[in-house]
Amino acid sequence: MTRILLLLLTFYRYFISPLLGGNNCRFYPTCSKYAKEALNTHGGIKGLWLIFKRIIKCQPLCDGGYDPVPPTK
């Protein structure tokens, strides 16, 4: 499952994101880099949950800033 999600993420980063204006993320690391790290660190299920929470925060009412992937416990 994780490999498929990483493949979809790669497709998004190289083909869809440039059409949307490229790097406009208000966070560091960018949301797509965060997603890749979350999937590699936590696997598919928890990684998807972390990605979902990050995307919800990525909106005009949030200042953004440094938001790393939490470490595994």
From Swiss-Prot:
The keyword Cytoplasm belongs to this UniProt entry's keyword annotation: no
Family annotation (SMART domains): Haemolytic (SM01234)
A Pfam entry, by short name: YidD
Keywords (A to Z) from UniProt: Cell inner membrane, Cell membrane, Membrane
Kinase is among the record's keywords: no
Domain of life from the UniProt record: Bacteria
Coiled-coil regions, chain positions: none
Membrane topology: Peripheral membrane protein
InterPro entries referenced in this protein's UniProt entry, alphabetically: Membr_insert_effic_factor_YidD
Gene Ontology CC entries for this record: plasma membrane
Record family assignment: Belongs to the UPF0161 family.
UniProt cross-references to HAMAP family, sorted A to Z: UPF0161_YidD
The protein's role, per its UniProt record: Could be involved in insertion of integral membrane proteins into the membrane.
The protein's name in its UniProt record: Putative membrane protein insertion efficiency factor
Organism in which the protein naturally occurs: Rickettsia bellii (strain OSU 85-389)
Organismal lineage: Bacteria, Pseudomonadati, Pseudomonadota, Alphaproteobacteria, Rickettsiales
